[in-house]
Regions:
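Glycine-rich phosphate-binding loops that contact phosphosugars or nucleotide phosphates
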Residues: 33-113
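Cofactor-/ligand-binding subdomain signature composed of acidic, glycine-rich
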Residues: 1-32
Length: 113
């Protein structure tokens, strides 16, 4: 593989694993408060990742969940997003306009992002 940087990949995984404790705290808090459903929000590559996460979760869990393309959600909305919805997203830059607007809309619709 050209330009493959093994150390960069290892560092990336290790950084993600270092967040596990904090992620578990957040999940425990959400479970204690209760939730209705989970929405994976993405655009482009992060939407593709959201679809993969959705498929994996459906395979292992009965939790109500779905994936939304951020641009479509901003344009058309989704009646399933509201109070009790947990929105999970990832963003490479944190400034993709569709994602920024999608987060604002989800919050306005009553979801926890």
């Amino acid at each position: 593989m050209l330009k493959f940087d093994e150390q960069k990949q290892l560092d990336s995984v290790n950084c993600a694993l270092a967040l596990r404790g904090r992620i578990e705290e957040i999940v425990d808090s959400i479970c204690a408060e209760g939730y209705k459903n989970i929405c994976w929000l993405g655009i482009g590559g992060t939407w593709a990742s959201a679809l993969q996460a959705e498929v994996h979760m459906k395979e292992k869990s009965a939790i109500e969940l779905f994936s939304e393309n951020a641009a479509e959600y901003v344009t058309t909305g989704n009646k399933r997003v509201g109070k009790g919805t947990i929105v999970i997203l990832s963003s490479v830059t944190g400034s993709t306009i569709e994602m920024v607007e999608g987060v604002k809309k989800a919050q306005a619709d009553g979801a926890k992002v």
